[in-house]
Swiss-Prot record:
Species, as recorded: Delia radicum
Family designation: Belongs to the AKH/HRTH/RPCH family.
InterPro entries: Adipokinetic_hormone_CS
Record-listed Tryptophan amide modification sites: W8
GO molecular-function term, one example from the UniProt record: hormone activity
Tissues and organs where the protein is expressed, per its UniProt entry: In larvae, expressed in the ring gland but not in midgut, CNS, thoracic perisympathetic organs (tPSO) and abdominal perisympathetic organs (aPSO) (at protein level). In adults, expressed in corpora cardiaca and corpora allata but not in brain and thoracic-abdominal ganglion (at protein level).
Function text: Probably causes a marked increase in hemolymph carbohydrate.
GO annotation terms (biological process): neuropeptide signaling pathway
Broad class of the protein's primary localization: secreted
In-chain residues carrying the UniProt-annotated modification Pyrrolidone carboxylic acid: Q1
Annotated protein name in UniProt: Adipokinetic hormone
Keywords attached to this entry: Amidation, Hormone, Neuropeptide, Pyrrolidone carboxylic acid, Secreted
GO CC terms in record: extracellular region
Cell compartment(s), UniProt: Secreted
Amino acid sequence: QLTFSPDW
């Protein structure tokens, strides 16, 4: 999945 997923 290449979507904006913040690692916080």
